[in-house]
Design a protein with these regions (language model features):
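Serine-dependent protease modules
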Residues: 1-169
Length: 169
């Protein structure tokens, strides 16, 4: 399986006004280069680049986007890549330890640990996501973590880091 230090960093380029910069995270789900990230990480991007921990950089093509679940599927032109295994998110319990891997504030390949605080949450005031059942965690999730995996202690992905709820936004 994939080690936490092998989580890719996703960069995008837009014509204007935003320039190049690490804006999200993602994770490989197959040896032939399929990557999961958040829709909001890649939506509207003119070019998407994925950097692996070994510093190889790949251009990525968007295969599919799902705005209601905030999921994007990307494809790299590569083979024999390490990839994650999925766990059972339904089996996650409140109090379970979890680990988020991502690039908060552009600090690539960072890890943060915490516990599952609640299950079945919706996002207050956001009708687009109110029907989605989210896992709430106290793991430090910041800008740049979006699209990265949430691992259980067995090393399986049980969630995708998507958004934070705070009084400061």
């Amino acid at each position: 399986g994939l080690r936490p230090d092998e989580i890719p960093d996703i960069q995008r380029q837009d014509r204007a006004p935003r320039q190049r910069g690490a804006v999200g995270s993602g994770f490989l789900i197959s040896a032939d280069g399929f990557v999961i990230t958040n829709n909001h990480v890649v939506e509207g991007a003119d070019q998407i680049q994925v950097t692996l921990n070994d510093r190889r950089v790949f251009d990525a093509e968007v295969v599919g986007l799902d705005e209601p679940s905030d999921i994007a599927l990307l494809k790299l032109d590569a083979a024999d890549l390490p990839f994650v295994e999925f766990g059972d998110s339904e089996a996650v319990r409140v109090g379970d330890w979890v680990l988020a891997i991502g690039s908060p504030f552009g600090l690539e390949f960072s890890a943060a640990a915490g516990i599952v605080s609640a299950k079945g949450r919706s996002v207050p005031g956001n009708s687009a996501y109110n029907y989605m059942a989210f896992i709430q965690t106290d793991v430090a999730i910041n800008q740049g973590n979006s699209g990265g995996p949430l691992f259980n202690l067995e090393g399986d992905v049980v969630g995708i880091n998507s958004q934070i709820l705070s009084s400061t936004g």
